[in-house]
Structure formats: structure tokens, C-alpha cells
Amino acid sequence: MRRDWPQAAVAYEESVTRAFDALGGVDLARAAEADRTRREALAAPALDLLGLRGLDPWGEEDESAAVMLAVRAAGAVVLPWPLAHELAVPAGLRGDVGGVHLTSGNVERLDHADLLRDAVAVDLDRGVARRVTAGAPRPAPLDPFASGVVLGAEAAGVDAARVTAMRMLLDAFWVTGALATAAELAVTHARDRQQFGKPIGKFGEIRWRVADLSLALDGLEELALHAWWLVRRGEARSADLLALRVQMIEAANTVLANGHQVMGAMGLCEEHDLTVIDRHLQSVLHRPAGRIASTGLLARAVAAEGFDGVYPVAAWR
């Protein structure tokens, strides 16, 4: 597995990052909570100008890598747009399917459903894609862009397994970007905040927390890269992507918990970016399934198909 990204993809990520910073970075997400129309007024035109929504994550290596890194850049500012949902749709279906949601069981609301025309929802338990009809906005403190939904008939022509794998992969890169920003905020605070005449990062408790969150982030980045490599080779199975999801959730819990501890009360203030990042991550961390339910799905997948890793596990049913 190559551990470095194609240079063209890295250059594209830099352009995407500059564009999102010009929109205000995390402030755009904060503003969009107060006025949902800012998603279409500001985020969508920027994405179209970059040509990002038209890229194909199943395309050639440079294009696919550019998608992953651009989604990571979007996550770094918790961009208020369903980018992973849109890009998880194969290029040949985008005229008929506007986005992909992942669900587990019955749902009554989904994030950004009001923006996605002719979206589908894939049930992880049944492996079936169904049409989504969006209703009125139903925001909640930890689900700021939710809308009510009704799931309809099965969507013909959608390869549920394929779009599920890509959506999980894109989610992981989006979360990686958000966690990288959270980690940077914590590290900067530990370096700059003075206590008893020295930076708080010199104290053992803070150093341990910074080490823990850095290790969790590095582990997620490495696993996301490996999962992308497996998908590119056509070797990824459901257990691989579910393992990535479980790692994503656990890494987020570690980075956010330790980040808040490093920041103290400041990190809980509404005006601080860490609070916004934490809040905007909750929908992807809990939908379609949280840590316990995702681990259960992973266990069932391993039982059915085995798992190739450092210590391979054979299927047993």
C-alpha cells in the first residue's frame, strides 16, 4: 500500500482548503445553523466553482484521491453541505439519485435531507435502498440540519453494497478532517495557555491527553487510507468498512473527550470552534448506528465473511 497521496490530489486539497477558509471556515457552519439558506447560498456555489460535486470517487487514482482529500478538507471546517452523501452516488446514477443516506431500521429524520433531490436510504440491516421523501426541517441541538423524512419504495438500479461502502469511506475522511481541526485547537491551547509560569502542555496530565488524541487521529488516518486502497483494488468487504466506522467513532470519542479536557470550560463555550465541531459530528457518529450498534454490525459481518488483518479471523457461519 502506498502511504503517500498523488501530488495532484494534494494540490487540489490545498485549493479546496483555501476556498473553504475564504467562506469563514467553521464560522460558516455556525452561521448555517442560524440560517439554513446559507448552505445553498454559500456552500453550494463554492463547491460548484471547485468542480468537487462532479468528481468520481470510483474514477482514476488521482481523481479518487482528490475526492478523499477534498472531503477531508470539508470535514476540517464541518462544511454544512451533504458532500459525502452526494459523492457516494456513482457518476452514472447522479441524474436519478441525488444522495445516499445510511440507516438502520426505521427513521423519521435525516441530516440535510431537504437539500438532496431523489435521495435514497440504504438500510444496513437489510441491504436495501429506498427512496427518501423529505419533509419540514426538524433541527435538534446535536442534529442541526435534520429534516423529517418518509421512506418509500425500493430504489431500482442502486447497488446498495457499493454505495454503502463508499459512503462509509467518505464519512471517515470527513470525520478525519474535523478531528484534525479539533486536535490542532487542543495542541495550540496546550502550547499557548500559561499556568504557574509555563505552558500547560508541560504538565503530565495535558501531555498524556494530547498524546492520546494524537494517536487516535493518526490511527484513523491510517485506517482510512488503507480502506481507500482496498476499495480501489476491489478487495474491500463489508467488515472492512464497518471496522473503519467503529474506529472512526472511537477515534472521535477520544479526540473530542481529550480535546475538551485540554481546553477546559473554554472548549464548551458556544463561540469556540471545538463546540461547533463536536456538535456537527454527532449526526455522522450516531447515524446509521452508534458505537455499540456499529460494533454489533461488524461482529455479524466478521461471522459471515471473516476478516483479513494482522490476525485473520475465519468466517464461522
Q: Residue ranges of each PLM-predicted region?
A:
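Long, well-ordered alpha-helical segments
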Residues: Y12, V16-A22, R126-G127, F145-V158, ...
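Glycine-rich phosphate/cofactor-binding loops in nucleotide/flavin-utilizing enzymes
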Residues: M1-R2, M266-R317
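Alpha-helical transition-metal enzyme core signature, strongest for iron centers
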Residues: T176-A183, V210-L213, L217-L220, A224, ...
